[in-house]
Amino acid sequence: MFIQIFIQTLVVSLLLIIALIIIRKNCCPYYAFLFILAYLVSRIVVRLPYFFGLDLGLNYTWTGHFLMIIWVLVFVWIGPLKAKDIGLTLKQYPDSIIPAIKLTIGITVFKGIMAAILTGQPNDILVETFLFQITMPPLAQELVHTGLLLTLMIFALGDRINQKTDWNRIIYLAVIVTAFSHGIKFALSYNGGLQLSIMAFIIPFIGKVVYAWLRLYTGSLLFPILAFSISNFVVWLVPYLLN
C-alpha cells in the first residue's frame, strides 16, 4: 500500500517539476516542497486507521477521512497559509453564486449520466454508503485538494488567489497538477506490478477541475463541497433508480 502511495507521489512530483520548469520566473520551491509534503502526508494519514485498528469495523474509511480534515486544519494552524487562503470562508465573491449553481448542476448531471452508463448493481451497504459519500469525501478531499494543495500549487508557481485572479497559464497549470494528483490515486496502482487505468483517472480528474473552478471563482470551498456532495448523492441514487 505504501509502495503505491510513494510511486503516485513520485509521479506527481515529476509533473510538479515540469510545471516549475514551464513557468520558471517567480517560482517558489518552498511552496512546491510543501505541496509534495502535504500530498504525501494526506495520502498516508487516510490509511493509518487500518494499521492501528481504528477503522471501527466499518466498510468505509471514516476515521481516515476525519484525520485528513484534522491534518489540513493543523497545517493551516502551524503553516504559512491562512484559512482564507485555502477557501475556508462562507463569503462568496460578488456575482459568483448563480454561475456556481449552474456549474454545480452541470457536474451533477454529468456524473449522474456516467453513473447510469458505468454503474452495475446497487451497493447493499445502503445507509453507510449514503452517509459516507455525502459527507466525508466532499469535506476531506476538497479541503485537501481544492483547498490546501491547489493553493500551495498556485503559490509555488508564483501567483496568489484573490477576487481578480486571472486564468493565466499559472492557474491552468496549478489546476491541472492538482487535479492530476487526485486522479492518479484511482488510476495508478501497484500489486506486484504497476497498473494504469485511464477510465479510473478521467472522472476524478474532471471533477477536481470543476471544483477548482468553483473554488477560484467564488473564493470559497462551500460550492466545491456542495457540488461534490450533491453529485455523490446522485451517483449513489442512480443504480437504485435503474434496477
Question: Each predicted region: which residue ranges?
Answer:
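Internal transmembrane alpha-helix with an interfacial aromatic "cap," most often the third helix
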Residues: F75-L88, V144-T146, A156
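Membrane-interface helix-boundary motifs at transmembrane edges
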Residues: I21-L34, A83-P94, G158-D166, R215
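Transmembrane helix-loop-helix hairpins at the membrane interface
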Residues: I5-L15, V109-A116, N123-N243
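Residue-level recognition of transmembrane alpha-helices
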Residues: A100-I101, F228
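N-terminal, membrane-interfacial amphipathic/helix-forming hydrophobic leader that caps
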Residues: M1-K82, G112, L188-L196, F233-N243
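A cytosolic-side transmembrane-helix exit/cap motif
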Residues: F35, P49-L58, A83-T89, L149-L150, ...
